[in-house]
Amino acid sequence: MVDQRRSALGFVLLLLCLVLFFDCVVVGQTQSRFSEKLILLNLRSSLGLRGTDWPIKGDPCVDWRGIQCENGSIIGINISGFRRTRIGKLNPQFSVDPLRNLTRLSYFNASGLALPGTIPEWFGVSLLALEVLDLSSCSVNGVVPFTLGNLTSLRTLNLSQNSLTSLVPSSLGQLLNLSQLDLSRNSFTGVLPQSFSSLKNLLTLDVSSNYLTGPIPPGLGALSKLIHLNFSSNSFSSPIPSELGDLVNLVDFDLSINSLSGSVPQELRKLSKLQLMAIGDNLLSGTLPVDLFSAESQLQTLVLRENGFSGSLPDVCWSLPKLRILDIAKNNFTGLLPYSSYDSDQIAEMVDISSNTFYGELTPILRRFRIMDLSGNYFEGKLPDYVTGENVSVTSNCLRNERRQKPSAICAAFYKSRGLDFDDFGRPNLTQPTSKNASSGISRRTVIILAAVGGGVAFILLFVILPIILVLCMRHRRRAAQRGNNDRPKPAGEASQQPPKGAQTFDLSRLGNAFSYEQLLQATEEFNDANLIKRGHSGNLFRGFLENGIPVVIKKIDVREGKSEGYISELELFSKAGHQRLVPFLGHCLENESQKFLVYKFMRHGDLASSLFRKSENEGDGLKSLDWITRLKIALGAAEGLSYLHHECSPPLVHRDVQASSILLDDKFEVRLGSLSEAYAQGDAYQSRISRLLRLPQSSEPSSSGVTNAICSYDVYCFGKVLLELVTGKLGISSPDNALAKEYMEEALPYISTNEKELVTKILDPSLMVDEDLLEEVWAMAIIAKSCLNPKPTRRPLMRHIVNALENPLKVVREDTNSGSGSSRLRTNSSRGSWNAAIFGSWRQSASDVTAVQAGATTSGGGGGGGGNGLRNSGSQGSSGRNNNNNGNSSSSRRRQSSEIVPEPAAYGVVEDNL
């Protein structure tokens, strides 16, 4: 009996202990979860995040966005795409100290969220469980802490698209579990650490768009699992290591835009899985190995452009089964095109073999390409049917009956040097003797023909040259009058820095500092190729540091190459125009007769083309890019700069080179317009002058000669392509050299409609994370882009109206709901409908339809001939109302309709018709 009581008592005590134990566990978990919730609330406060994402009353593991838990503990935080409160937006900081106590945290993603500041040292001390760290596009600056090498569990490290500087820490070579490493689009300097050779699990290595120098470490050949390798846009030198041929799993191989030298290693033939090989824009030379690619190669893109390759291109390169792009332009390749046939399923996108020395006849192998640039070679014979159309360029060859070909003497000499015959474009040999009678007959006909041709030429010359002489005389008289009004003594020391004789005169004392040639030599290390940023059409750009350590960009212009007109125009522009949206001009050096130098402030984020796009770390084709807020900021900044040139300069200035690469970005992504050497006063280009005199119709597109007419609507068209590039994330839409841009725009524009917002998601950059409000802003920008891309120049909006629209994007797509009366709503709908019709209704109309729309717009304006002016004034009132809200004018305080933000283009169409 006693034993039974003892057993029962023991069982009760055991049960009591278990209850107490589980109670302690539950209490501990509750306290732990509560403390972690407090940590996240502190993080929300320090980063200024909105409470709707992390509400105080919710359970972080259940109700909070971006939180991942395991066994009740927080192990993952994703705040990418989060929006800040109004106060949080005013002063964003890298303030994440509360994370220090989340020792089990294995995932942290803040990509796209502005975190200006340096990465804390304690990241590599307190967060040792981290497996994923993504701080891409976070405005992080400073150096990468050496302690990150302690995060040995790390599998993904993405620090791309920031402002990180100094050396890449060698301690990153200790992250042996790392599979994704992306350091692209920063300002890293120095050499790539040899310790990276230890990262044997690496699948992606991207250090593109930095300032790295020195050789590529041969030890990288040991990274046998590597799939994506991108070292482009740096200053790597020395030959390509043959050890890279051991990367047998490599799919993407990009070493373009560096200073690599030597020949292509034979060992690269082992890269049988390659889909992309880009080694263009280097100093490579020699011949390509014949067996570099096999007939079973998976290669889709081959870029060898702008090197010094010679010899023949291996025949297999033309018939690669999956080839889409072949770009070998600007080399010394030579030989005949192969006569091999192709499979009809092997249609490729583009081939660019321009500026080489290929010769002979064009062969059927070209049938597989949709877009072809064959210019600058020595092809002869007749142009085949399959090499025609607007997507083909064959200029500067030796083709028969084609325009803009090389002189026959040059072609004959080229073929003679190779022991080949040339038929002189198929013309008969005029040196053969003829009979006396035939000679007499030909002579009489010749006299008649020459007389007729001579008379016609004389008439044309009189009709064309006389107006030109009159215009030049008037301009000369006007300039003389201006010089008479502006004569003054020149400052001391200015004489040595005068523009060349015959140039437009301007005041150099207002153009920044006059640098000496020795200063610029020292700043650029004697213009070392390692400091070369890019070769531009108006001069080569070098990075450098002045004596006081200020980073600068120096444009080197070779006057002997005929580039003097561009720099003179640029100096004249800077002497007369000044605006915060133009690239800061620091000075010049004009003391050298054959070379001139212009000095600009260094833009830390380069240009839009290099800051917007980068390859995704995934194997897909997606692009990862700037967040939407930054894109809209860039679009507005560029529009403000162009609006200044168009509307605040007299006469209006046309930029003529608006594209992503001419939109420069400082360290805060503020826009500065560059590439100003092409700027002209509206209507001042030579062809435009002739068109005005003869009343010929003008086009806003480049002419066949490559000269663009200087009218503001051309800038608007190009700006529309930039906006479309920002919306879609498609690389190179705004580039004038991109042959695919026109085709893509024709495919994308039907998805832009003022009536259906969801359509725009079909072309939206997939890397953008946007909520409903932001999607409406995207929609609005797409609508503005489409209006800019109207094929009729007179129906494109003015740039100042585009600025208003980008400042108020939601008003472009939202109807006014503040008005209560039916008549007000009717006016709103009518106004919006007119704007829709102005943008889209005439997209495919003829010129007569445009006139009809203009007449209708004038009539609806309710004032006879004043309808157009009324629309223009409404836009101006809206702008002034934004700056003077207390003037008592009710019209300035009401919400503007979409047609007021960007008035109907028909209202100002007459102005451009008279240009």
Swiss-Prot record:
Biased composition (Gly residues): 859-870
Annotated stretches, region: Disordered: 482-503, 851-915
Domain of life: Eukaryota
Catalytic site: D657
EC number, UniProt record: 2.7.11.1
Residue ranges that the UniProt entry lists as topological domain Extracellular: 29-451
InterPro entries in the cross-refs: Kinase-like_dom_sf, Leu-rich_rpt, Leu-rich_rpt_typical-subtyp, LRR_dom_sf, LRR_R13L4/SHOC2-like, Prot_kinase_dom, Ser-Thr/Tyr_kinase_cat_dom
Residues bearing attached sugar chains per UniProt: N71, N78, N101, N109, N150, N158, N177, N230, N332, N391, N429, N437
Protein name: Probable LRR receptor-like serine/threonine-protein kinase At2g16250
Organism: Arabidopsis thaliana
